[in-house]
Each structure stands twice: as structure tokens, then as C-alpha cells.
Amino acid sequence: MSLFSFFKNEEKPSSAARAKERLQVVIAHERGAVERPDYLPQLQRDLLEVIKKYVDISEDKLDIKVDCIGGLSTLEVNVELPDS
């Protein structure tokens, strides 16, 4: 190892590689937004209202996810209940 190689900067990814990586992130994000059903926000509000009839919770305690894998759609509902 020479003295000059010790102080040499590590190779940085090219701007094209960085742009490609950023584009992949944007495309993945938009694909996720496109696959989101239109009824999901209303479903979340309706579920929150039903749960509020029995338990006092805020909207941030309810999380709803819809996944579609191979033609099979799944609905995942997570509710954080307060301690009694």
C-alpha cells in the first residue's frame, strides 16, 4: 500500500447510477399508489367510526393495508387499543 493510495478517495457511484436508483424508488412508490383501491380511505373512516362506538381511539391508531399477490387480495387491519 503506497502513501498515495491511503489518501485516495473511494470511488463514488456515477451520476447515472444515482439517477437510476432514484428513478427505481419513484417508480416503486407510484406503483404502490396505483394499486391502492379507491375505497380504502372511506373504508378506514367507516371502520374507525364502528370501533369508536365501543372504544375511544384516534385515527392514527388504525392502520389498513391491502395487498394483492397473484390475484389474491388481502386486507390487513391493525387497531391499537388503549389499556383498560
UniProtKB/Swiss-Prot annotation:
Main function: Prevents the cell division inhibition by proteins MinC and MinD at internal division sites while permitting inhibition at polar sites. This ensures cell division at the proper site by restricting the formation of a division septum at the midpoint of the long axis of the cell.
Similarity annotation: Belongs to the MinE family.
Lineage top rank: taxon: Bacteria
Any single GO BP term: cell division
Sorted UniProt keywords: Cell cycle, Cell division
Protein name in the entry: Cell division topological specificity factor
Statement: the UniProt record of this protein carries the keyword Lipid metabolism: no
Gene source species: Desulfotalea psychrophila (strain LSv54 / DSM 12343)
Pfam families the record matches: MinE (PF03776)
